């Protein structure tokens, strides 16, 4: 079997560590792993297939001989190293938002638009976590009738803000239990026993950057250039897995039975929809999973051509690391 030299840019972060874990779990044909990080992490090691692999400092020369680079770093790092990665002949599968809306860069959810991989010119973008979870859930509906508009509310776990998110939540809970105060450092407000209805800065007409990603990225992934999405993104005191409430609107009626049938067999989805027996997607059940759970499918009472649903997915795995590895799997099948 042919093997590949795979670099992970940002190997010490939460997503980078998960990428290394998923590479092992999915038996990706890695001949050599090259973990890359900042100078302060160089010389440390990561575990891969039972062995210690030394972390190297990210530099332009580090990509020589690499076949695939999995990006788990911030926008500035992705932009800094993208030219060197492409020049080296490697393919850059980037989890940052740096290139997502670039018309020359495919934006891929393998269950939705795998055919777009062939259009890459050295860079492929991984979509935003909540976008991945949502389009994986609703794409099956789009095969019944094109989705015209969507209204979504996201309930995003604290780990979506990085490794410091869960630590801050736990510290606040402990401080409150002891009657002490705790000054938030990761979030703009206390997150324990609270909701924060802002993720990202204001971008357009009162919508945040996180909220606009759902429309802009959803259009590109599902090949629906006229799709309109109104989204509200909320940070919630859940450690892991994002949840999304979605209303989809079509030009023709789509029944609940039709929706359940296509979602039950849709790639990357698991139908969990039995309200009578209290069975529906929940963050606790989807954490550390690679599929999106979908349920609470019902008519939209405000629109005869609308359907509502609820979906949950692990934003570190399917929303980031696993989706990137799935893209790499498409590349090696080419």
Task: Give names to the regions the model predicted.
Residues 69, 158-334:
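Charged docking surfaces used in two-component/phosphorelay signaling
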């Amino acid at each position: 079997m042919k093997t590949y030299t795979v670099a992970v840019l940002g190997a010490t972060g939460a997503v980078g560590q998960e990428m290394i874990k998923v590479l092992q779990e999915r038996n990706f044909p890695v001949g050599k792993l090259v973990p890359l990080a900042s100078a302060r992490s160089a010389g440390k090691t990561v575990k891969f297939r039972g062995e210690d692999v030394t972390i190297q400092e990210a530099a332009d020369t580090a990509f020589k001989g690499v076949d695939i680079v999995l990006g788990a770093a911030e926008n500035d790092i992705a932009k800094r190293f993208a030219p060197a990665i492409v020049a080296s002949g490697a393919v850059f599968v980037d989890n940052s938002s740096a290139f997502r809306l670039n018309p020359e860069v495919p934006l891929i959810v393998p269950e939705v638009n795998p055919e777009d991989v062939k259009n890459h010119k050295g860079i492929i973008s991984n979509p935003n976590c909540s976008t991945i979870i949502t389009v994986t859930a609703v794409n099956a509906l789009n095969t019944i009738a094109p989705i015209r508009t969507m209204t979504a509310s996201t309930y995003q776990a604290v780990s979506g803000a990085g490794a410091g998110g869960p630590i801050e939540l736990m510290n606040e809970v402990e401080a409150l239990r002891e009657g002490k105060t705790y000054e938030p450092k990761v979030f703009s407000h206390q997150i324990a026993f609270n909701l924060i209805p802002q993720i990202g800065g204001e971008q357009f007409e009162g919508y945040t950057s996180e909220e606009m990603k759902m429309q802009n990225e959803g259009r590109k992934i599902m090949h629906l250039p006229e799709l309109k999405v109104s989204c509200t993104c909320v940070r919630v005191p859940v450690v892991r897995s994002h949840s999304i409430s979605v209303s989809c609107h079509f030009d023709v009626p789509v029944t609940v039975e039709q929706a359940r049938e296509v979602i039950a067999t849709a790639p990357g989805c698991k139908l969990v929809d039995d309200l009578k027996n209290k069975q529906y997607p929940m963050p606790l059940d989807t954490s550390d999973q690679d599929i999106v759970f979908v349920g609470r499918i019902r008519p939209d009472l405000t629109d005869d051509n609308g359907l509502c649903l609820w979906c949950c997915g692990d934003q570190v795995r399917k929303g980031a690391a696993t989706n990137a590895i799935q893209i790499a799997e498409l590349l090696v099948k080419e």
